[in-house]
UniProtKB/Swiss-Prot annotation:
InterPro entries: aa-tRNA-synt_IIb, aa-tRNA-synth_II, aa-tRNA-synth_II/BPL/LPL, Anticodon-bd, Anticodon-bd_dom_sf, Beta-grasp_dom_sf, TGS, TGS-like
Assembly behavior: Homodimer.
Entry binding sites for Zn(2+): 334, 385, 511
Residue ranges, annotated region (Catalytic): 243-534
Entry annotated with the keyword Transcription: no
One GO cellular component term noted in the UniProt record for this chain: cytosol
Protein EC: 6.1.1.3
Descriptive protein name: Threonine--tRNA ligase
PANTHER family in UniProt: THREONINE--TRNA LIGASE, CHLOROPLASTIC_MITOCHONDRIAL 2, THREONINE-TRNA LIGASE
Cofactor(s) for this UniProt protein: Zn(2+)
Protein localization: Cytoplasm
Group of enzyme by EC: ligase
UniProt cofactor note: Binds 1 zinc ion per subunit.
Amino acid sequence: MPVITLPDGSQRHYDHPVSPMDVALDIGPGLAKATIAGRVNGELVDASDLIENDATLSIITAKDEEGLEIIRHSCAHLLGHAIKQLWPHTKMAIGPVVDNGFYYDVDLDRTLTQEDVEALEKRMHELAEKNYDVIKKKVSWHEARETFVKRGESYKVSILDENIAHDDKPGLYHHEEYVDMCRGPHVPNMRFCHHFKLMKTAGAYWRGDSNNKMLQRIYGTAWADKKALNAYLQRLEEAAKRDHRKIGKQLDLYHMQEEAPGMVFWHNDGWTIFRELEVFVRSKLKEYQYQEVKGPFMMDRVLWEKTGHWDNYKDAMFTTSSENREYCIKPMNCPGHVQIFNQGLKSYRDLPLRMAEFGSCHRNEPSGALHGLMRVRGFTQDDAHIFCTEEQIRDEVNACIRMVYDMYSTFGFEKIVVKLSTRPDKRIGSDEMWDRAEADLAVALEENNIPFEYQLGEGAFYGPKIEFTLYDCLDRAWQCGTVQLDFSLPSRLSASYVGEDNERKVPVMIHRAILGSMERFIGILTEEFAGFFPTWLAPVQVVVMNITDSQSEYVNELTQKLQNAGIRVKADLRNEKIGFKIREHTLRRVPYMLVCGDKEVEAGKVAVRTRRGKDLGSLDVNDVIEKLQQEIRSRSLQQLEE
């Protein structure tokens, strides 16, 4: 009979099989009331599942990450319960958990309206408030199939026929009259599923195949308590205000259009931000001793066959042909950089060779995945490749890591999660080579006092990598930086150098990106700053305004002086009230507004206001210029007097 070992090491002995709920009741009624599921010998199980042999057991509650995931999964079943009550002929497909919530794909003979979604959510609340028990039954494959055939659930039957072995025992979860099929676990009672909201609907093909029927996907979010739900909804509201697509339109930064899906039309102000970002990156390339190069936009398909991209990546590549030759528009820059490396004989004395490019790349992303600047088809990478010896890997990775943190800190990103991906089962190279490479990456991170977690087996077949994920002010994750070792591509493209022993050797290649896609990073910055770009990045840094026509000449002189000082400035001499002008330029997020009235003209000064509404008073013109230059030169995140 089972001996149950709890997380604190204590043991409980039973003379009969017990469930996690039985053990929780044995410990105390409070824990039993909070029990959602159990973890038995490391495996998640339902609270009602029986433990027949000695085992370790952890009780899962809503405070656990797994508990919240189970709540979300059960809310998907609750959605199924509600939709079948409102529209009984609906056919249910799949209802998994996703980030922050869940969805259910349904086959319904009507297009769901916003009113339908509201009615569905209302019915879900009515059902959840009944606090009914969720009953799990393990049945034979044949019984499960018969159940869903009788209910007309053709998608469930398809899952059984194609995805579940005939000797398996599927779990059927009974929500009163509604039955769903799942591996589980699920909540034991619907009292855990009170805090949810349906978010949106979308189209989705059955099994993700465009040859299949288009279903309706209903998305929802669910949380353990009302406070967490409200906090999430507030974050979404704030994110909507910061949406780079909305701000990009307000500030006239860029646009996209149907004739060029996933391609950016940069307007003057957006392109100003892009170019300033390039200037910043170039300053770091110089500091960290990189060469800057430029490769062609397209190369013969034969080259992409040599690299392996054609076999593994051709669906994402745009192609064209000329004079009976097929060309690929480059989806990445590395093969071109190897071609540059291959020009001329290289010696070990030439290494490390650090090669950087603002590489214009194109990838044939699915149209449904395109999203403003965040997911595009045409983009520019702040890409670099370092050619080095095995002995130089650690020092080069060390420098890459310092560069990553140096650049991210300029934008105020402080929370950065780092992951080290190790060797997969299918790989090239010896175990000794992988041992050394993984150790070099780990030691480089440790030497920089950077905590990291391993992603075992998640490296590429050609080498391990470090991924840097930054978190923005809304605590959203953005995977931007990568340091990837590559033991394959240089060999495939016949790259070599002459070693100290006068023998030809293949260099190690380090792929290094920090911002990732320039377009995407500008999207991230737009949302991070809500369009209030730091002064050094702002398209227009200063607007000079008159109050009446008598100050026009002074405004023009001051504007010219600011331009000569390297400041991006505009004069606003319109015959409008000064309050109107200030409001308009505040909405345009211009960092500084300089107001010139008769007093300022007489004293040779200027009244300074910030876009946050702070009045800095009447200041000497030369002092203002000097302070602005210092703020811009230092790439400060703060404005004057902050």
